[in-house]
């Protein structure tokens, strides 16, 4: 009898888990959520900065005050020059004869190279962040609005490492592992650091540790990452930038009919620039050694006019 009661209680408990954890599940629910959390018009109809507006002068001063030891950590993974399952477009470096000069060539979007996404990089139903029409933004010479050049003055703010692999006591999360609000809040409790307006959230899944141990795999098809249900929480916290050691989204997508729901919600609905493929291994080790999970971060992409992003070497300063 006791066994039956326990099984019944367990089944009831599973049945009454909040549905929000799995929401949105399909394209209709996704559309509902997109419009519910949208930041379009929040900073004016002509805004091109999005959530970067929350990085105020006061926020920069607060971030600078976090520098205690002067330790710096790069968040960039060295450019991958060999074709692999996660690197369809290897970085090319050519020396020019006669001089110590070189030429670089890279198609950085994807799952190999550390880079930042501009707000014009993603669209939803033919509109970018703030409701600009595709036809008015996308041209052969680049984006007329929301290009990476909007961040020409750079970003200095508080960075917060959210290390879900360490939270779970593993070297890395297995590909396809979804990360929910419960996980983010459990990390806040463990680390003692609560996300706040203007912050850059950096999510470590251990992707690069797994790659170093087991070799490359198709990250586009299978990667640990955020579930789309975290988007309202990210807006509530006021996060300005989100980065991870893969592409932020859990893959494959858990929202039927939507390929990259987190990219779409964060970039297009909320106006949040994403930092893809950051190497957070050294950052995780340094933060653990210092027992400090917050730091100053600098983000300074080359301001290509109308660019959809740029390779990035973000720096954390403790």
Give, region by region, the residue ranges found by the protein language model.
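Active-/binding-site microenvironments in catalytic and ligand-binding cores
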Residues: 17-318
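Hydrophobic h-region of N-terminal signal peptides that target proteins for export
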Residues: 8-17
């Amino acid at each position: 009898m006791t066994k039956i009661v326990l099984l019944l209680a367990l089944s009831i408990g599973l049945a009454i888990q909040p549905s929000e954890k799995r929401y949105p599940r399909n394209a209709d629910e996704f559309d509902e959520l997109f419009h519910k959390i949208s930041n379009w018009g929040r900073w004016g109809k002509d805004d091109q900065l999005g959530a970067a507006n929350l990085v105020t002068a006061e926020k920069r001063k607060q971030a600078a005050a976090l520098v205690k030891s002067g330790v710096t950590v790069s968040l960039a993974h060295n450019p991958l020059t060999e074709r692999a399952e996660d690197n369809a477009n290897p970085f090319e470096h050519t020396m020019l004869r006669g001089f110590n000069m070189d030429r670089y060539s890279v198609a950085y979007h994807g799952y190999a190279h550390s880079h930042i996404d501009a707000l014009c990089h993603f669209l939803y139903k033919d509109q970018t962040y703030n409701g600009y029409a595709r036809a008015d933004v996308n041209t052969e010479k680049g984006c007329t609005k929301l290009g990476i050049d909007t961040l020409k003055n750079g970003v200095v703010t508080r960075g917060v490492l959210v290390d879900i692999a360490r939270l779970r006591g593993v070297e890395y999360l297995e590909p396809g592992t979804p990360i929910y609000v419960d996980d983010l809040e459990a990390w806040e409790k463990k680390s003692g650091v609560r996300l706040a307006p203007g912050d850059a959230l950096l999510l470590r899944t251990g992707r690069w540790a797994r790659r170093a141990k087991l070799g490359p795999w198709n990250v586009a098809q299978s990667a640990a990452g955020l579930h789309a249900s975290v988007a309202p929480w990210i807006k509530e916290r006021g996060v300005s930038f989100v980065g991870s050691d893969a592409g932020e989204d859990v893959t494959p997508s858990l929202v039927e009919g939507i390929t990259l729901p987190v990219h779409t919600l964060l970039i297009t609905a909320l106006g949040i620039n994403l930092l893809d493929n950051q190497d957070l291994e050294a950052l995780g080790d340094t933060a653990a050694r210092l027992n400090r999970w917050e730091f100053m971060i600098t983000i300074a992409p080359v301001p290509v006019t109308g660019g959809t992003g740029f390779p990035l070497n973000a720096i954390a300063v403790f």
